A protein has these predicted regions:
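RNA-interacting cores
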Residues: 1-141
């Protein structure tokens, strides 16, 4: 993992945990022999948008994009979300603690704002503590 010097650390957590992480400001963390200095923190609300994107959603369907999309649609409907478009990206793998983790990116579009907030709160699929299945507003041109 190569991070530019000005990369911002973003933590998504409930409001009641803000005080817990504020003690990190000004500290330096050692990650794989490299020092990372933690700056000041800012509170930011979840995005009000109709298009959300997750860079990494765990894909346990093998190399079958259609099966992944079918699973994603089923999971989204299980959350009672309303949407019109779902697009999957290329499959990629990264090292997990026990075995490689296969993922795909996923875009969910044309959602009501309240459903988009719910998806940002809930996420999709396993390994969310590793950052998988977390959705952010998609930047459009």
């Amino acid at each position: 993992l190569y991070l530019p010097r000005r990369t911002k650390l973003t933590l998504r957590l409930p409001r009641e945990r803000l005080q817990d992480v504020s003690v990190l400001s000004g500290l330096s963390l050692q990650v794989n022999g490299h020092s990372i200095k933690i700056g000041g923190c800012k509170q930011r609300l979840l995005g009000l948008t109709t298009v959300l994107y997750s860079r990494y959603v765990v894909d346990s369907t093998g190399d079958d994009e259609d099966a992944f999309l079918a699973w994603a649609v089923w999971e989204l409907k299980a959350l009672r979300l309303r949407f019109k478009k779902v697009l999957a990206g290329k499959r990629c793998e990264f090292a997990g603690t026990d075995a490689p983790v296969a993922t795909r990116s996923l875009l969910v579009a044309d959602m009501p704002h309240e459903d988009a907030v719910l998806l940002q709160q809930q996420g999709l699929g396993p390994k969310r503590a590793m950052g998988c299945g977390l959705f952010v507003p998609h930047k459009t041109i």
